[in-house]
């Protein structure tokens, strides 16, 4: 009986731990420079290597390219096999051999869309495609008058059929599969479902998106991507055209049912290029991943980059999400989202996976199309994430704050209101109003900590050197709360103090506005309410209102 009781207690504690893990809101260490030669990290890379080799063996893959980036550098890469997998005398693969990235091309098309929206070339992502491409039409028998929009096309929510209405073997022929032919065929077809009824992956939608964007920008799609995306990112060995890369193209294979292999023919996509015809190298794609993991305002505004990587549609499995056009999955083991895009054409299967909170990116490419849920990136991420988090914390990394630090705030031309820094002591005190609102600032630990008269604590930090009277509050331990509390409550709010000068040249705060409520200083003592047994009958009313 005693043994059973101990077992029951152990099981209960495990269940409590798992519930807390599931219900808590994870936070991640700030990506800082770490020692890439650390034995723990080198062991992790070796395990990734073993995963790839096992996957190659299990799926009959003869040649493979893998690269991992962290922050702004390639930290690990390895190639397996030869440029021609069927010729042992062929040169060994390198990360400078071209591959077909197939549907990863869609991320370039969507990036073009965000650029043109930000420039004002298209006025809104919710503009209907027909506004810029009046020749396009498709039948609609549903109870809606709306035609597909840029946002719907870019995120597979348009209800368009999956494929361009042209035989695959003819796509490269601009006469057989000309724009006029495709548009004429579409005019006799119908939407397969209303927009936003369900995610329906559509190569046609992205091809139409790219061609419509080109019309809006009065240019060719391929020319735009080359000049506005590829070259600015240093992707000089990437192209939409076979002739540009044929001298360094890695050869893809076809594996037949009888176990034999042949070199896959290269069939280009013509009008459908925006959906999947970009050739690139692993080195070039590392530059591309580093763009998504970091910031490059010359390519895309940082706020738009966040928008571009946001979810659009949650699938019924509860942990898979479609974006524009990233396909995202939640790594349950490590409590983190992985933003991914995979592509497959005859002879090639490639996946780009981005773990943006940690600034880790993976580009894995097989010179053989094969059928598995991913290109080994999920297993690799499950190894890399905990190791990186451990090493980051050991290196002194602090938990992330998603707000913009002072170094990234836009300078203003206004004169600062205060000529000297406001000391932390000036903010300390208990602030109240007649409605029962409470805001308490304490620095007894050496750091500014705030609360709204309850047990939920907030770290307090400076907002900007230009506005020293404005502070920011952040939930002290977000991992202890539901994510809903973290995003729905007062987390990351700004609080505005009224500053006055004392007769002896000092500075004091006599009121504060927090969460829209203005409160005056009741006492410089943060324990004022508790020490005086003061209760405000409305004190919890406001608090609960903002936590609902």
From Swiss-Prot:
Annotated compartments: Secreted
Secretion signal, residue range per the UniProt entry: 1-24
Disulphide bridges: none
Coiled-coil features, chain-numbered ranges: none
Glycosylation sites noted in the Swiss-Prot or TrEMBL record: 237, 258, 443, 459
GO cellular component, one term: extracellular region
Domain of life assignment: Eukaryota
Keyword tags: Glycoprotein, Secreted, Signal
UniProt xrefs under Pfam families: Beta-lactamase
Family indicated by similarity: Belongs to the beta-lactamase family.
Protein name stated in the entry: Beta-lactamase-like protein 2
């Amino acid at each position: 009986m005693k043994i059973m009781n101990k077992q029951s207690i152990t099981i209960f504690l495990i269940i409590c731990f798992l519930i807390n893990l599931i219900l808590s809101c994870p936070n991640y260490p700030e990506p800082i420079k770490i020692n890439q030669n650390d034995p723990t990290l080198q062991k992790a890379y070796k395990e990734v290597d073993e995963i790839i080799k096992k996957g190659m063996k299990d799926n009959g893959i003869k040649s493979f390219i893998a690269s991992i980036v962290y922050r702004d550098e390639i930290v690990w890469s390895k190639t397996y096999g030869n440029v021609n997998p069927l010729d042992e005398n062929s040169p060994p693969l390198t990360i400078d051999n071209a591959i077909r990235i197939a549907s990863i091309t869609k991320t370039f098309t969507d990036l073009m869309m965000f650029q043109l929206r930000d420039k004002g070339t298209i006025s809104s992502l919710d503009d209907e495609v027909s506004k810029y491409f009046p020749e396009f039409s498709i039948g609609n028998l549903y109870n809606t008058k709306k035609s597909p929009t840029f946002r719907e096309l870019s995120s597979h929510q348009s209800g368009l059929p999956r494929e361009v209405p042209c035989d695959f073997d003819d796509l490269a022929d601009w006469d057989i599969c000309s724009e006029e032919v495709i548009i004429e065929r579409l005019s006799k077809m119908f939407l397969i479902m209303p927009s936003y009824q369900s995610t329906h992956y559509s190569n046609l939608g992205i091809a139409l998106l790219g061609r419509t964007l080109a019309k809006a920008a009065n240019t060719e799609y391929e020319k735009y991507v080359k000049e506005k995306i590829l070259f600015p990112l240093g992707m000089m060995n990437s192209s939409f055209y076979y002739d540009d890369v044929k001298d360094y193209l890695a050869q893809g294979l076809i594996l037949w049912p009888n176990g034999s292999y042949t070199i896959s023919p290269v069939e280009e996509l013509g009008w459908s290029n925006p959906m999947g015809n970009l050739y690139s190298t692993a080195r070039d794609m590392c530059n591309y991943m580093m763009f998504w993991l970091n910031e490059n305002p010359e390519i895309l505004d940082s706020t738009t980059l966040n928008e571009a990587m946001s979810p659009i549609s949650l699938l019924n499995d509860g942990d898979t999400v479609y974006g524009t056009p990233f396909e995202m999955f939640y790594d349950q083991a490590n409590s983190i989202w992985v933003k991914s895009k995979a592509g497959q054409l005859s002879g090639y299967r490639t996946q780009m996976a981005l773990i943006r909170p940690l600034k880790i990116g993976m580009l894995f490419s097989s010179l053989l199309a094969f059928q598995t849920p991913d290109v080994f990136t999920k297993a690799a991420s499950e190894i890399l994430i905990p190791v990186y988090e451990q090493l980051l914390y050991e290196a002194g990394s602090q938990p992330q704050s998603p707000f913009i630090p002072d170094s990234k705030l836009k300078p203003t031309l206004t004169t600062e209101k205060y000529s000297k820094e406001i000391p932390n002591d000036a903010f300390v005190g208990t602030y109240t109003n007649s409605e029962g609102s409470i805001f308490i600032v304490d620095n007894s630990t050496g750091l500014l900590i705030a609360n709204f008269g309850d047990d939920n604590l907030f770290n307090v930090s400076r907002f900007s050197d230009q506005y020293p009277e404005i502070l920011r509050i952040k939930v002290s331990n977000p991992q202890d709360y539901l994510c809903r509390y973290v995003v729905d409550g007062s987390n990351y709010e700004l609080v505005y103090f009224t500053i006055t000068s004392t007769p002896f040249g000092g500075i004091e705060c006599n009121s504060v506005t927090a969460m829209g409520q203005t409160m005056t200083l009741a006492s410089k003592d943060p324990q004022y309410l508790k020490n005086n047994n003061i209760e405000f009958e409305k004190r919890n009313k406001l608090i609960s209102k903002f936590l609902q």
